[in-house]
Amino acid sequence: MVLRSEILTKKSELPTPDQALPGRESAMPVPEAHFVNGRPLTAPFPAGLQQVLFGMGCFWGAERRLWQQPGVWVTAVGYAGGYTPNPTYDEVCSGLTGHSEVVLVVYNPQETSFEQLLKVFWEAHDPTQGMRQGGDIGTQYRSVIYTFDAAQKAAALASRESFQAELAKAGYDRITTEIADVPPFYYAEAYHQQYLAKNPNGYCGLGGTGVCLPA
């Protein structure tokens, strides 16, 4: 078993439930409205909208890319896929929560398709890098898709195989993206929400491979 001290220093190993930080019962307070479009950040959302969680490295740049997509109703950043309830950003960065930085995407399926969002996801980052994304190193930067229903999961798995074939042609390694049913989602602190709209010159590590997902 990997020691807790090794997780803190190497940042490439996920903790076990026993090693994870305890967290807290109270949820993180977040703004009522999206900084860019003014829509509610939290449920309930209007009927007919669908949701997905995408993790593609640092969530600042990922959220901006996603809120810019036609048909996306609202976005929010947070943490998912780990063990610690209601973690703080510093706790997630320690590697001892097991969470990935993710973007909650709420979209209108009458205006965009899940397949179109998958295309944005695959092409906007490098899904072969394991527990990092570019210069951002740690388990919190791993590539993930957390789906809300069986149809989404099937589409995500099919798109992964399709994109893998294109990556192989370009000489890339195997995709490491985790695709799973949606786990609990915990909102990140208010200052992380729509960070790059509030800080236009802020850090954005988002970068793709140049490989395209076939239609």
UniProtKB/Swiss-Prot annotation:
One of its GO terms (cellular component) is cytoplasm. Its EC number is 1.8.4.11. One of its GO terms (biological process) is cellular response to oxidative stress. InterPro entries: Met_Sox_Rdtase_MsrA_dom, Met_Sox_Rdtase_MsrA_sf, MsrA_MetSO_reductase. It catalyses: L-methionyl-[protein] + [thioredoxin]-disulfide + H2O = L-methionyl-(S)-S-oxide-[protein] + [thioredoxin]-dithiol; [thioredoxin]-disulfide + L-methionine + H2O = L-methionine (S)-S-oxide + [thioredoxin]-dithiol. GO terms for molecular function: L-methionine-(S)-S-oxide reductase activity; peptide-methionine (S)-S-oxide reductase activity. The keyword Oxidoreductase applies. Pfam families: PMSR. The keyword Chaperone does not apply. It is an enzyme of class 1 (oxidoreductase). Has an important function as a repair enzyme for proteins that have been inactivated by oxidation. Catalyzes the reversible oxidation-reduction of methionine sulfoxide in proteins to methionine. Belongs to the MsrA Met sulfoxide reductase family. NCBIfam families: msrA (TIGR00401). This is Peptide methionine sulfoxide reductase MsrA. It comes from Pseudomonas aeruginosa (strain LESB58).
